[in-house]
A protein has these predicted regions:
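Soluble catalytic domains of enzymes that build or remodel membrane lipids, polysaccharides, and related
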Residues: 1-216
């Protein structure tokens, strides 16, 4: 799981190459990119052909991508077109079955006020199969619990990125970072692998998340 790459002025092709190498070392069954793949514009990703690096992610069940709020900042259509060239499956309010044992629901970002309610995406799914939801911003926990999602994967917060912002994140988000459980739904909010703005962190860490998931 990677979120918040923020490919742009500071997160360039050489860094993405390192991220992909790290991901491949994990030998994961599935890869998910949980929003804010790009920073403010698509120019650098396009000019440096960063999609060629992302196409090197090796995961037998595939790579799945959802949008973040930064995908809605400038050049929206160009960003969507570029994401389709990365070799991953772009899920925008849609459902995939990486194999026959579970569903993967990819939500549009909350920035889009017309995004579909979760119920409309899950109402026709087999209730006996687990449901994993990819949703960039960790702000719809109650909706996920009500709709009996099993696992939610999120990014967006960077866990504040700079001290003392982690304290502020705790005031804004029910869970700004890490593992959380509410009702029968489990969540993981990543601090992100990249950086927004200045290319450094103070008091927080960048992360590539490896999850071991067992269905009962």
């Amino acid at each position: 799981m990677m979120s918040d790459l923020h490919i742009g002025e500071t997160i360039n092709r050489s860094l993405v190459h390192k991220y992909v190498a790290m991901a491949n070392e994990q030998k994961a069954d599935m890869a998910v990119l949980v929003g804010d793949i790009m920073d403010y514009e698509s120019r650098i990703a396009v000019n440096q052909k960063v999609e060629e690096e992302l196409r090197q992610i090796h995961a037998p069940l595939g790579t799945y991508i959802v949008l973040g709020n930064h995908e809605y900042r400038a050049n929206i259509n160009a960003k969507h077109k570029w994401l389709l060239q990365t070799g991953g499956t772009l899920l925008i309010d849609s459902v995939a079955m990486p194999d026959s044992t579970f569903y993967l629901v990819g939500r549009d970002d909350l920035v889009n006020k017309k995004r579909k309610p979760l119920h409309s995406l899950t109402k026709d799914l087999d209730p006996d199969l687990p449901v994993i939801v990819l949703d960039h911003q960790p702000l719809a926990f109650n909706e996920m619990v009500m709709n009996k999602a099993d696992l939610g994967l999120h990014g967006h917060t960077h866990n504040g990125q700079f001290w003392p912002y982690p304290l502020i994140m705790k005031l804004i988000f029910e869970c700004p970072y890490g593992y959380y459980k509410k009702g029968d739904t489990q969540f993981y909010v990543s601090s992100g692998i990249g950086c927004a703005g200045p290319p450094y962190r103070v008091g927080t860490v960048s992360e590539l998340v490896v999850l071991h998931i067992t269905f009962r």
